[in-house]
């Protein structure tokens, strides 16, 4: 009598770590010489980042500082989708960036295709914004995890509830 093992594939961003990274980035910007007198700011509204700066060059520098801090805090930067740069009030420019939470249908199909192409005896089911993979052999499940990690997906995925 063999019991089935399973794990879930999710794509989540820890918002508390994002908030910490924003605070550290703002502290660095306040102390940097090239940002003296600048109206640069980063804010977080639910699952959207808003970057504001004097011009596009400073906005790119602001984005580089933020990405560095996010990486240091362990936040996946693949899950950030940047919008276009738009003019804002007071001669500044703004850019919105959406934090992607969960796996959408398109990426779920890609992941399911990767799982099917392994040829292993595992089943995968899409459950809302996550995918559950189950099979009798834990070795097969680990091979599926390795195959998904090797694939170049547009989002960062985590593996949880390994049973």
UniProtKB/Swiss-Prot annotation:
<dbReference type="Pfam" id="PF04461">
    <property type="entry name" value="DUF520"/>
</dbReference>
<dbReference type="GO" id="GO:0005829">
    <property type="term" value="C:cytosol"/>
</dbReference>
<dbReference type="InterPro" id="IPR035570">
    <property type="entry name" value="UPF0234_N"/>
</dbReference>
<comment type="similarity">
    <text>Belongs to the YajQ family.</text>
</comment>
<dbReference type="InterPro" id="IPR036183">
    <property type="entry name" value="YajQ-like_sf"/>
</dbReference>
<protein>
    <recommendedName>
        <fullName>Nucleotide-binding protein GWCH70_0711</fullName>
    </recommendedName>
</protein>
<comment type="function">
    <text>Nucleotide-binding protein.</text>
</comment>
<dbReference type="InterPro" id="IPR007551">
    <property type="entry name" value="DUF520"/>
</dbReference>
<keyword id="KW-0547">Nucleotide-binding</keyword>
<dbReference type="GO" id="GO:0000166">
    <property type="term" value="F:nucleotide binding"/>
</dbReference>
<dbReference type="InterPro" id="IPR035571">
    <property type="entry name" value="UPF0234-like_C"/>
</dbReference>
């Amino acid at each position: 009598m063999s019991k089935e093992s399973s794990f879930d594939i999710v794509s989540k961003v820890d918002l508390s770590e994002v908030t910490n990274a924003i605070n550290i980035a703002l502290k660095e910007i306040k102390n940097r010489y090239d940002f003296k007198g600048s109206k640069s700011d980063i804010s977080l509204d639910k699952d959207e980042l808003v970057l504001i700066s004097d011009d596009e060059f400073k906005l790119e520098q602001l984005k580089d500082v933020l990405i560095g801090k996010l990486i240091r805090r362990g936040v996946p930067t693949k899950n950030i989708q940047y919008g276009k740069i738009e003019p804002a009030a007071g001669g500044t420019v703004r850019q919105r960036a959406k934090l992607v939470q969960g796996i959408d249908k398109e990426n779920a199909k890609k992941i399911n295709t990767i799982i099917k192409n392994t040829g292993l005896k595992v089943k995968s089911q899409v459950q809302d914004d996550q995918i559950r993979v189950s099979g009798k052999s834990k070795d097969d499940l680990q091979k599926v995890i390795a195959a998904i990690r090797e694939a170049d997906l547009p989002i960062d995925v985590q593996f949880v509830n390994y049973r």
